[in-house]
Swiss-Prot record:
Chlorophyll a B1 binds at residue 654. The keyword Lyase does not apply. One of its GO terms (cellular component) is photosystem I. It comes from Platanus occidentalis. This is Photosystem I P700 chlorophyll a apoprotein A2. It is a multi-pass membrane protein. Its EC number is 1.97.1.12. InterPro entries: PSI_PsaA/B, PSI_PsaA/B_CS, PSI_PsaA/B_sf, PSI_PsaB. GO terms for molecular function: 4 iron, 4 sulfur cluster binding; chlorophyll binding; electron transfer activity; magnesium ion binding; oxidoreductase activity. The keyword Transmembrane applies. Keywords: 4Fe-4S, Chlorophyll, Chloroplast, Chromophore, Electron transport, Iron, Iron-sulfur, Magnesium, Membrane, Metal-binding, Oxidoreductase, Photosynthesis, Photosystem I, Plastid, Thylakoid, Transmembrane, Transmembrane helix, Transport.
Amino acid sequence: MALRFPRFSQGLAQDPTTRRIWFGIATAHDFESHDDITEERLYQNIFASHFGQLAIIFLWTSGNLFHVAWQGNFESWVRDPLHVRPIAHAIWDPHFGQPAVEAFTRGGALGPVNIAYSGVYQWWYTIGLRTNEDLYTGALFLLFLSAVSLIAGWLHLQPKWKPSVSWFKNAESRLNHHLSGLFGVSSLAWTGHLVHVAIPGSRGEYVRWNNFLDVLPHPQGLGPLFTGQWNLYAQNPDSSSHLFGTAQGAGTAILTLLGGFHPQTQSLWLTDIAHHHLAIALIFLVAGHMYRTNFGIGHSMKDLLEAHTPPGGRLGRGHKGLYDTINNSVHFQLGLALASLGVITSLVAQHMYSLPAYAFIAQDFTTQAALYTHHQYIAGFIMTGAFAHGAIFFIRDYNPEQNKDNVLARMLDHKEAIISHLSWASLFLGFHTLGLYVHNDVMLAFGTPEKQILIEPIFAQWIQSAHGKTSYGFDVLLSSTNSPAFNAGRSIWLPGWLNAVNENSNSLFLTIGPGDFLVHHAIALGLHTTTLILVKGALDARGSKLMPDKKDFGYSFPCDGPGRGGTCDISAWDAFYLAVFWMLNTIGWVTFYWHWKHITLWQGNVSQFNESSTYLMGWLRDYLWLNSSQLINGYNPFGMNSLSVWAWMFLFGHLVWATGFMFLISWRGYWQELIETLAWAHERTPLANLIRWRDKPVALSIVQARLVGLAHFSVGYIFTYAAFLIASTSGKFG
């Protein structure tokens, strides 16, 4: 008999029902559960899949470059970045009639195209790319890297090239390699690219391989570096009248600390960015030489952790046992990596709009909105994943003997205190915030808006003032003209910062009021509740008073049968599942807030946000309803327009989202009966009965149906908001 899917589980392969397919897909990446898995093979599989991941990333970015070079308008966009709409790629659709062809033929194209709202044009322009040939070259190079990654992944699965377990567990060497080799060297290389290619490019000098060694990035070359006169590299920066991409108003500095934004491009100074990457490179190159490898010098991670005795003995045995616990658990390591990456991704969202690094991206409002929303959603999924793998660690890898009385064990010991405090914070935030919103709603409804409860966010305003925002009149630190910090700031460090903070044309420290105070606390409610569910799921993953033997049932189980009441919905997987709904909900509020605040800022009517955001009806009517009008108008009696694709996606997103509830609410028996009826009818229908199943059709398990429901809910939710966001922003600002 031929080997049936899944090959990694003979038990599943012999299952006579369709469960074989679904469980096979569900456990395909759970290497630990596969037949004949050893620790060595587990690490080698993970290592090889990393190369596969890299290959996919390189292929994807190569595709972006290739399609823009082939079907885009990069060269004409470069000549006029503020007025030419960047094209992502062409559209070929046999359904398009003449009105559709006309509606989607934009940006100087000959036929229908998609407009790029990803910011790649601004990114490539900023780093020195100027022609389609440059884009093709980049696409080919990334294609080559993709192939190299695939070969490397295959190679490391061959017997001769398989790394050993000890190699994977050599934490110090890996730290040194990642810190110095990846972060340090790549940051240094990026500084080199910025100084040698991007900065000359911004000054009208086209540097490529043919003239790379002839064009000096700085008139004095390496002289100042070797003579210690590093300040020369900061002298004569670009002037405020500099036209990006030309020599007009250009300086000669390569590493500066100007602060603020380039007046024409509204983005950070390239010379500041180069300086930043050089500093990062230096820090990481040093950090990557701190840990002890085969040379016998430097820190040992284990010694560091063991030596750390908490003051006053308040934390038991501190970090003893942690080194081996973390180093022997891929789930713990993945949890830490995901937590870090999730936070970084959210920080990217926050900083890409407030401190834009790419030329002219700040004036492309739809791109700004799309990138913020994109990075916040990605961050949400990554962060929830961190807790999921933390819970799996507690179930599969945690050893109570090894961690006696250390910080990890003590977390588990006082989990009731942690969970109840989080619960209290969530309840407090929820009831008070909702109470204020609803009170204000009622006052508006009764025609007495002056009776609203409006709270000024004075602490946040004070913090903004301390950073130099003068409009609140706090007169403190950087907003006080008498303070030493203010005076030093005018000359020594970041002279452009204070101008940028107090200019109302950017997104640095936006003016905040009672509406911001309320939505801030609504978001805090969402964050605390999501955290509560995730933390409880992880801390109760091994067991609870209700179910002390929970860890024996694994990460995802529906219930312990009918004889044991109350054991449904309490697996660690169920906590993750519930938390994802809250995560999506919270990011919904975050993106609504960001988008509405910015739409009113860009349109010059900030009072609309300030007045309408203090009560729920304001959000529903003046943000959601008012801004969905363009969407609902995508198709009308006069034909169609370029927003019609978003109108369709808006409807389709709602459909996918609503489909999710079909899986989330109906139970298993209902589907089993329906499937059996359909199978009966199928087998008795001419032509249809020529096709038979090899597997007996059975309904999804409870956990699987929840996953399918959650996937539809998430995808539909994000599709719907993406269509709303892009249509409402591009409909207003082009």
